[in-house]
């Protein structure tokens, strides 16, 4: 029986959802909501939580009780040339999110920010053709100026690009190293790692 299970796991590509978590704050509640949403939508795939060492044991226990796979990652600091002020100070920890490209035990992953709510099954996104990076276009304030204005203190709005809160990708160490090299030569932006990925 064990051999049969092993053979089956070899025949089927390994897929999972992945999210990022750092610190002892309330963000864990969003990740719990994400895990519950994926279960309610009857997703066939697990949720991997890429987390920094500062996530407390209490939060880890909560996530494990929700069926999450916990994967501790080391913090990744921005390079010295990225000392600019970010739109939000906590964006600096988001460079660590780039480590999810190291998760080569999976063939394909769907990254979801921990504060995303899943209302329907999105497993079909795993079936998109391999070899591509899939993401959704970011929605900037100028798309709905009657509701939200781009803050003048942030300067000109950035060019159109995707939102790094949801994307489909294939983890590879070579891609991870290419991203790190790109970070070194890319001027810093207000949105930390998000612009690096475009």
Per-segment meaning from a language model:
Residues 1-198:
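Glycosyltransferase catalytic domains, chiefly GT-A lineage
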